[in-house]
Swiss-Prot record:
Alphabetic keyword roster: Cytoplasm, Methyltransferase, Nucleotide biosynthesis, Transferase
E.C. number: 2.1.1.45
Source organism phylogeny: Bacteria, Pseudomonadati, Pseudomonadota, Betaproteobacteria, Neisseriales
Reactions catalysed according to its record: dUMP + (6R)-5,10-methylene-5,6,7,8-tetrahydrofolate = 7,8-dihydrofolate + dTMP
The protein's name: Thymidylate synthase
Length: 264
């Protein structure tokens, strides 16, 4: 995961100090890209320990089209707690846009199912896109989509994915985003009869919050370790049938966790 440390170092050394919505302040750059070959290990950060359980359950929750945190709470995942209302609702966030994008004629479009079908029937399509950024509904969302749009690409029997992330909290959010979209790519590849290729991560505003500088410096002192391997139950052939128990991580030996505050 040298690529991630390079991003962090680049922002610290070359970024612009800015104010932000949360009042914390950031140092940021605009426009950056990382690439991860999914055939060379699962890109789960090793320079600090990550809570894989939260990453997997959040992705399964997105794929259900769910926008209430009850499922997450039932599975001891708290990463969305700060944004939910008193009923646990978040508004029409990621899952709703992925699975139920509202069309002007009253239909609801299942973008994930549509892309799956197109990967199988028309793998050379340049329209294998899912968007979570719906301008008509952004103001109704508890948090507008940070990871806003992703596109799939098939070549030589491998499925790759590129994510455009408009806003990236490098210390807390980005490690989760890398692992989540890498896993989604692997799951999509399996159910489409393909191998996993690359995950390409493209950023708009990539930033470190000012209250994360000390933690970032500590992480940069640590040497990356060998990437783990993600084993996925090969019997699952339907994307929407995956369960938490279908994933097994082997060989994860990270440095200790580094605590940092979330800016809401």
């Amino acid at each position: 995961m040298k690529a991630y440390l390079d991003l962090m170092r680049h922002v610290l050394d070359n970024g612009t100090d800015k104010s932000d919505r949360t009042g914390t302040g950031t140092r940021s750059v605009f426009g950056y890209q990382m690439r991860f070959d999914l055939g060379k290990g699962f890109p789960l950060l090793t320079t600090k320990k990550l809570h894989l359980r939260s990453i997997i359950h959040e992705l399964l929750w997105f794929l259900k089209g769910d926008t209430n945190i009850k499922y997450l709470k039932d599975n001891n995942v708290s990463i969305w707690d700060e944004w939910a209302d008193e009923n646990g609702d978040l508004g029409p966030v990621y899952g709703y846009q992925w699975r139920n994008w509202p069309a002007p004629d009253g239909r609801h479009i299942d973008q994930i199912a549509n892309v799956l079908e197109q990967i199988k029937k028309n793998p050379d399509s340049r329209r294998l896109i899912v968007s979570a950024w719906n301008p008509a509904l952004v103001d109704e969302m508890a948090l507008p989509p940070c990871h806003a749009l992703f596109q799939f690409y098939v070549a030589d029997g491998k499925l790759s994915c590129q994510l455009y992330q408009r806003s990236a909290d490098i210390f807390l959010g980005v490690p989760f985003n890398i692992a989540s979209y890498a896993l989604l790519t692997m799951m999509m590849a399996q159910v489409c009869g393909l191998e996993a290729g690359e995950f390409v991560h493209t950023f708009g505003d990539a930033h470190l919050y000012r209250n994360h500088f000390e933690q970032a410096a500590l992480q940069l002192e640590r040497e990356p370790r060998a990437l783990p391997v993600m084993k996925i139950n090969p019997e699952v052939k339907d994307l929407f049938s995956f369960k938490f128990e279908d994933f097994e991580l082997e060989g994860y030996d990270p440095h200790p966790h580094i605590k940092a505050a979330v800016s809401v």
